[in-house]
Curated annotation (Swiss-Prot):
Residues 144-163 are annotated as: Disordered. Present with 2900 molecules/cell in log phase SD medium. Heterohexamer of two PFD-alpha type and four PFD-beta type subunits. This is Prefoldin subunit 5. PANTHER family: PREFOLDIN SUBUNIT 5. One of its GO terms (biological process) is protein folding. It comes from Saccharomyces cerevisiae (strain ATCC 204508 / S288c) (Baker's yeast). Signal peptide: none annotated. The keyword Chaperone applies. One of its GO terms (cellular component) is prefoldin complex. Belongs to the prefoldin subunit alpha family. Gene3D superfamilies: 1.10.287.370.
Length: 163
């Protein structure tokens, strides 16, 4: 992200288009980042919901399907519905109580919410800049068209005065 200020009024249409293209690429990057954060937040929220469901009284001994991969499930049985294996990253798991596991995932959700707000603010700012650049492109095109029209009128006056 560039923090350098550019005077858009001093750029020609080609330069304005290049700046707009750069802003559009940055905007696309931030939009994709926001989507990734939203997906991760959804997964952590789902973990919280699953822990709450499994840890309810009476669920001990219940049968369930345990995901072994994205498309493979293994039959399982809840032995202790008060303890959970929590993925803390890079393939490491830690046993936590239901309350501690929920707190762990809630902390992650809160962090992602904060980051999402920051990215949304950046997206709004980039969108406003992009719209401003579009307006400058239109103005530059109008100025260019007016200059060409004026030049043609002067050319026609010269031709009519020499004829």
């Amino acid at each position: 992200m560039s923090s350098q200020k550019i005077d858009l009024t001093k750029l020609n249409p080609e330069q304005l288009n290049a700046v707009k293209q750069q802003f559009d690429q940055e905007l696309q990057h931030f939009t994709q980042s926001l989507q990734a954060l939203t997906m991760a937040k959804g997964k952590f929220t789902e973990c919280i919901d699953d822990i709450k469901t499994v840890s309810q009284a009476g669920n001990e001994g219940q049968k369930l399907l345990v995901p072994a991969s994205a498309s493979l499930y293994i039959p399982g049985k809840i032995v202790d519905n008060k303890k959970f294996m929590v993925d803390i990253g890079t393939g490491y798991y830690v046993e936590k109580s239901a309350e501690a596991a929920i707190a762990f995932y809630q902390k992650k959700v809160d962090k992602l919410n904060k980051e999402s707000v920051q990215i949304q603010d950046i997206i709004k700012e980039k969108t406003q800049y992009s719209l401003s650049i579009e307006a400058q492109i239109r103005q530059a095109a109008i100025r260019q068209h007016e200059a060409m029209s004026k030049q043609q009128q002067q050319q026609q006056k010269k031709e009519s005065s020499t004829a």
